[in-house]
A protein has these predicted regions:
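Acidic/polar, glycine-enriched structural segments that form the non-catalytic walls/loops
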Residues: 17-25, 35-406
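Short, glycine/acidic-rich hinge or "gate" loops at secondary-structure transitions
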Residues: 387-396, 448-450, 512-516, 533-543
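Conserved beta-strand/loop subsegment of P-loop NTPase cores
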Residues: 5-7
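Substrate-binding groove/exosite segments of carbohydrate-active enzymes
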Residues: 344-505
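A conserved hydrophobic secondary-structure block that centers on an alpha-helix together
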Residues: 201-202, 502-512, 516-519, 523, ...
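Acidic/histidine-rich catalytic neighborhood
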Residues: 523, 527-551
């Protein structure tokens, strides 16, 4: 059978969409949904008319769909949280959720900055019981930008009353996030906002924002503020919100003209984070920046006389350092020439990654797209440019650098993740395995605490390799506490042994096996030897006090 190369959506009936739906890009969202369901590219009538060659136009659209994630509109709450996770930009050292700069922490949306290995343990009182949890920390926020028009007292925010259009796009090939939005105020003054964002893959300490605004139907002074915020807290997971949410104290905060510096230290783990931010643009003079200081945050404020139809741009570079990532702590801050220069540098780094990891699927658009989505998010969570180049002592969390579910802990998921790295980036796979080797002593302590020999790796691992699984579980139906048996999932040690063997088998890295892998295998074998009991009646060994992979 001849494959379908594509389709053309000639038009929708005149009354098919309301004017509000048309403005909100609902037609584009519908066309995309049909293309994904039909597994084939669809052109609009306008795209067909503009295409000199129809077959080339179908192929161009196919390539676009296979390399991009697009979301139209805005559904606050659980749906929005999921979209933000999927639109995360990251480079293995840091991750930024796919929010726009106007968004702040709320039930509707959740901007966050995550740094690999940034954990803190805090006690919380829940239902009469004091529990301790090691959490993946939401680091200080430097992404927030807001504006107000004329003499308005309130900053424009995203709400059903103000939002007219929102389209967010993530380029999987280059790691570039773009958001285009139209907001209106109470006087129906409309302003178009375009945000571009990258986590620089070539320089893992850096992330960059470009923020452009354009008055569509008015001219007026516009006041713009960008914030360095140390008041943020963990709020990503609804069921964790009754736990201690603030994990650090601000230890230093300063601003000088277009530059801010914030330093924080986690409350228990004593890890320091420093963020240096620099705003640039030809829409303001450094001397005209107003500084507004609070106890835990600083705002830089500029006012621009904006004219209808004219675009105005501000750029922000943020340099992130973490004391537990020693090389990042020692790297000096180097200002970039522009957002465009940083984006090109990052795109070149992504190009080298895709040269090794891209798998081409013929004749199945959605399989191709899904493969790239998964590969992209793996590389955003751990990359040769960060984990390997900076020798990060971390592994990949259950939610990557995208969110706080499972408290950012490392489980046995590595058994599904490491084959990707072993195949395409073996040196990065080795660095991820060293995370386990460096915590071998904790695994041996864990085994001894349960009267076993050898090394028993924890079901949930975080900063130092101790068992971070809760011993008690709160039943949400009856409010009673009971034993949490998930701690008995011992197969994580088998997965680690398999991963070490697979790496050696695939790479023939004998030096790794001599220095690290062999010791891990031996200690894990000792654990299972001590955990197994011979049944004299059957002549077979058995294990008990375990929970299987199906939980």
């Amino acid at each position: 059978a001849t494959p379908i190369l594509g389709g053309i959506v000639a038009d929708f009936p005149a009354d098919f969409f309301s004017p509000e739906e048309t403005l909100a890009l609902v037609p584009q969202a519908v066309i995309q949904a049909f293309a994904e369901q039909l597994n084939t590219p669809l052109l609009t009538a306008a795209e067909q008319a503009a295409a000199p060659n129809l077959l080339a136009a179908f192929e161009e659209k196919r390539q676009y769909l296979a390399w991009h994630l697009d979301y139209y509109g805005y559904v606050p709450g659980k749906n929005e949280y999921a979209v933000e996770s999927l639109l995360t930009v990251g480079n293995g050292f840091l991750g930024l959720r796919g929010t726009t700069p106007e968004m702040t922490i709320s039930d509707d949306h959740y901007p966050a900055t995550y740094i690999a290995g940034l954990y803190n343990t805090a006690a919380s009182e829940v239902a009469g019981q004091v529990v301790e949890n090691e959490d993946f920390v939401n680091a200080p926020d430097n992404q927030h930008i807001a504006l107000k028009i004329g003499d308005a007292t309130d900053w424009l925010t995203i709400s059903p009353d103000t939002l007219q259009q929102l389209h967010r796009q993530l380029n999987l090939k280059t790691g570039l996030f773009v958001a285009e939005m139209i907001l209106k105020d109470a006087d129906n003054q409309q302003i178009k906002l375009t945000t571009k964002k990258i986590a620089n893959m070539a320089q893992p300490n850096d992330y960059h924002l470009q923020y452009t605004f354009e008055p569509l139907n008015f001219s007026a002074p516009i006041t713009l503020k960008t914030v360095t915020d140390g008041s943020v807290y963990n709020y990503n997971v609804a069921r964790y919100r009754n736990l201690t949410a603030k994990h650090f104290q601000v230890t230093a905060l300063s601003a000088q003209e277009n530059k801010t510096v914030i330093e924080v230290c986690t409350n228990q783990s004593n890890l320091s984070v420093r963020e240096t931010a620099l705003i640039t643009g030809d829409i303001f003079e450094k001397e005209a920046i107003m500084i507004q200081e609070e106890a835990e945050k600083i705002a830089q404020v500029v006012t621009v006389m904006a004219h209808q139809g004219t675009r105005y741009t501000l750029e922000k570079q943020v340099f992130v350092q973490a004391s537990h990532a020693e090389q990042s702590w020692q790297v000096p801050f180097t200002p970039k020439d522009s957002f465009a220069a940083a984006a090109q540098e990052s795109a070149r780094a992504w190009q080298t990654l895709w040269q090794q990891a891209n798998i081409t699927v013929t004749g199945d658009l959605m399989s191709q797209k899904l493969l790239r989505i998964h590969s992209y998010h793996l590389l955003a969570s751990a990359s040769p440019f960060s984990n390997q180049a900076q020798a990060l002592d971390v592994s990949i969390t259950a939610r990557g650098l995208h969110g706080e579910a499972y408290r950012g802990h490392i489980f046995w998921d590595e058994i599904f993740i490491l084959p990707f790295y072993i195949q395409h980036y073996p040196d990065t796979a080795k660095q991820l395995l060293l995370y386990r080797y460096h915590r071998l002593e904790k695994a041996k302590e864990n085994a001894a605490a349960s009267q076993y020999r050898g090394a028993m790796y924890p079901w949930q691992s975080g900063r130092d390799g101790r068992e971070t699984t809760q011993k008690l579980h709160l039943n949400p139906l009856n409010g009673h506490w009971g034993e949490d048996h998930s701690i008995l999932q011992r197969h994580v040690s088998l997965a680690i042994a398999y991963n070490a063997w697979l790496y050696w088998h695939s790479t023939q890295d004998h030096e790794f096996m001599k220095q690290y892998g062999g010791e891990m295998l031996l200690e894990i074998a000792q654990f299972w030897n001590s955990a197994a009991t011979l049944d004299d009646a059957t002549g077979r060994f058995f294990i008990d006090k375990v929970m299987g992979p199906d939980e």
